[in-house]
């Protein structure tokens, strides 16, 4: 797996910014171990909205089949996948699983590029926003993955337009170091009061 950005004709997912500069619909994806949240932008790349929640299918990849269909039906120009790095910035098992998922997706939708963005605390932010809207806990479970995908995509859209700093979604973004790499503080970002940070089991 290369850490560089996706290039035209290169189906490998990439981490670099900025992404594809063409106008058009972009798809945001929040990959969990149980469910996959999907969001989409308007063609102007201003607003992200929820699309659906897919059940993971590790054997038959039915969820990837549905994602491919969504990308094609909406004529998406790019797919943005949240990368659940640990609060320290290190990559654990969850990140490896997401990278593998994204590689399969990238091969299926090439030449549409697939790009990673840091999604730390995204699910926390999704839970918080739904709580603020009065969504009950039981209903929240079925919606949180879509909301997390919205958070991932909206932050990327805002960063692209220069109205949000690239970095951690759902909390204040740390400044980039001299080498241009964004790193979390030593103790990691602090979750909002009363909110339990998400686990990898989503």
Curated annotation (Swiss-Prot):
Its main location: cytoplasm. The keyword Acetylation does not apply. Residues 1-27, 170-202 are annotated as: Disordered. Keywords: Cytoplasm, Hydrolase, Nuclease, Ribosome biogenesis. It comes from the Bacteria. It is found in: Cytoplasm. Residues 9-20 have a biased composition (Basic and acidic residues). Its EC number is 3.1.-.-. One of its GO terms (cellular component) is cytosol. GO terms for molecular function: nuclease activity. InterPro entries: RNaseH-like_sf, YqgF, YqgF/RNaseH-like_dom, YqgF/RNaseH-like_dom_sf. GO terms for biological process: rRNA 5'-end processing. Belongs to the YqgF nuclease family. HAMAP family: Nuclease_YqgF. Could be a nuclease involved in processing of the 5'-end of pre-16S rRNA. NCBIfam families: RNAse_H_YqgF. This is Putative pre-16S rRNA nuclease. It comes from Frankia casuarinae (strain DSM 45818 / CECT 9043 / HFP020203 / CcI3).
